[in-house]
Amino acid sequence: MVLIRVLANLLILQLSYAQKSSELIIGGDECNINEHRFLVALYTFRSRRFHCSGTLINQEWVLSAARCDRKNIRIKLGMHSTNVTNEDVQTRVPKEKFFCLSSKTYTKWNKDIMLIRLKRPVNNSTHIAPVSLPSNPPSLGSVCRVMGWGTISATKETHPDVPHCANINILDYSVCRAAYARLPATSRTLCAGILEGGKDTCHGDSGGPLICNGQVQGIVSWGGHPCGLPRKPGLYTKVFDHLDWIKSIIAGNKDATCPP
């Protein structure tokens, strides 16, 4: 019965996607300048080139992936074009960083999460505002939004000047287990993508948000290579499962433990 239910879900999703034209993140379009006020870019002082994204969840805290940790991180907020600076762009450095596991010992299918406390709070502005944490986990089949300055080519590193956005769907975790043999039977990750491929997060999008109904439900973690292959969805750290840890850290409990 479980197998029949999974196959039925896959068929429904495939039929619904077949009527949608592929958009040319991978398979995305330039984000509207006003839809990503919570999106931040992470880069290092020396390189001055971003390597990851993150999500502003209040004036003092940014959510990203553990894999995005670096020394001398700089955080740029309010940015759209990397070539044209908005008047309200703000740059911050971390005051503290928190992990479920060490940034060196997380696994790619579990606990890929980093919480950054900014040295100075940011001010809300035309292009800067936090996004809400989830009130409930996302439903299977939910249409969600991914965004970032990651490569827009599956075969070569082609980074856009502006963030790209794409709509993808929450898929049954069994779809990702079928795609990636080493995935455990259960994990605190979301499986999301497009079954026929063509839309996906890719290199440079790590740490960025998966937005469902105006709430950050996932953190870009990892996926197939090349990006955007059929039946190779992406894996996203499930924010809802880490909600108690996030709220405890923000409240000042530095000894808070992550879910097992």
From Swiss-Prot:
Gene3D superfamilies in UniProt: Trypsin-like serine proteases (2.40.10.10)
Keyword Cytoplasm: no
Gene Ontology biological-process annotations: proteolysis
Keywords recorded for this protein, A-Z: Disulfide bond, Glycoprotein, Hemostasis impairing toxin, Secreted, Serine protease homolog, Signal, Toxin
UniProt key word Glycoprotein: yes
Record Pfam families: Trypsin
Known glycosylation sites: 83, 123-124
UniProt record similarity statement: Belongs to the peptidase S1 family. Snake venom subfamily.
The protein's name: Snake venom serine protease homolog 1
Organism: Trimeresurus stejnegeri (Chinese green tree viper)
Lineage: Eukaryota, Metazoa, Chordata, Craniata, Vertebrata
